UniProtKB/Swiss-Prot annotation:
Keywords associated with the record: Fatty acid biosynthesis, Fatty acid metabolism, Lipid biosynthesis, Lipid metabolism, Mitochondrion, NAD, Oxidoreductase, Phosphoprotein, Steroid biosynthesis
Name by which UniProt lists this protein: (3R)-3-hydroxyacyl-CoA dehydrogenase
Name of encoding gene: HSD17B8
Modified residues (N6-succinyllysine): 160, 173
Gene3D superfamilies: NAD(P)-binding Rossmann-like Domain
Length: 261
């Protein structure tokens, strides 16, 4: 079984945004571990390069045998940057990515009564607009090349149930769910599957800013009794990226340990 997983994505080229840390890095490691070539993208180029180093490159003794991963830098909230990212990936690997995972995301928390328009706009721009731009550019590349693919967008359970102090984040992640379902309806005839993943409270750099007393309270609400790890999300992404999920599209998979059932 282990050897099968190591080769499950052996022919895949995977573009992962937000690959410099947290869920994005864990997804990159998991996909590479299953044989995929990874194009790791982050706003922080050095962080993306560090992820690629962890994957192992040509001639490296670490990582999967195929190796040839590459790092890219892009601000996915800008249309031109998103288009250029896909062009750069295609130029580097001579084909469009068959797996696209949008993990890039930010928070700017504040209560609704005090939230600034700027904080609203920043979160919507990265989390929702950025996911739209990458999804659109990837779909255009796949369709124009006559290729099948799997697009996986990282949403959040907060997009389904809301959360105090996160009106902008909740709205952005709810939008990702709707975007992904609509994309699935439109792109299915092209052989492109689109699914979203809804993490719960996952131990990442983003959640490390949460006060410990809040973490303890949330942990008490999780039936599984503990926070999730980025690898828990990566496990689901790898399944959705593979042909093991070949008849699954338009779905939203919750990775929450049972939080907010």
């Amino acid at each position: 079984m282990a050897s099968q997983l190591q080769n499950r994505l052996r022919s895949a080229l995977a573009l992962v945004t937000g690959a410099g840390s947290g869920i994005g890095r864990a997804v990159s490691v998991r996909l590479a571990g299953e044989g995929a070539t990874v194009a790791a993208c982050d706003l922080d180029r050095a962080a993306a390069q560090e992820t690629v180093r962890l994957l192992g490159g040509p001639g490296s003794k670490e990582g999967p045998p195929r190796g040839n991963h590459a790092a890219f830098q892009a601000d996915v909230s800008e249309a031109r940057a998103a288009r250029c990212l896909l062009e750069q990936v295609q130029a580097c690997f001579s084909r469009p990515p068959s797996v696209v995972v949008s993990c890039a995301g930010i928070t700017q928390d504040e209560f609704l009564l005090h939230m600034s328009e700027d904080d609203w706009d920043k979160v919507i721009a990265v989390n929702l607009k950025g996911t739209f731009l990458v999804t659109q550019a990837a779909a255009q590349a796949l369709v124009s090349n006559g290729c099948r693919g799997s697009i996986i967008n990282i949403s959040s359970i907060v997009g389904k149930v809301g959360n105090v102090g996160q009106t902008n984040y909740a709205a952005s992640k709810a939008g990702v769910i709707g975007l992904t379902q609509t994309a699935a309806r439109e792109l299915g005839r092209h052989g492109i599957r689109c699914n979203s993943v809804l993490p719960g409270f996952i131990a990442t750099p983003m959640t490390q800013k949460v006060p410990q007393k809040v973490v303890d309270k949330i942990t008490e609400m999780i039936p599984m009794g503990h926070l999730g790890d980025p690898e828990d999300v990566a496990d689901v992404v790898a399944f959705l990226a593979s042909e093991d999920s070949g008849y699954i599209t338009g779905t939203s998979v919750e990775v929450t340990g049972g939080l907010f059932m």
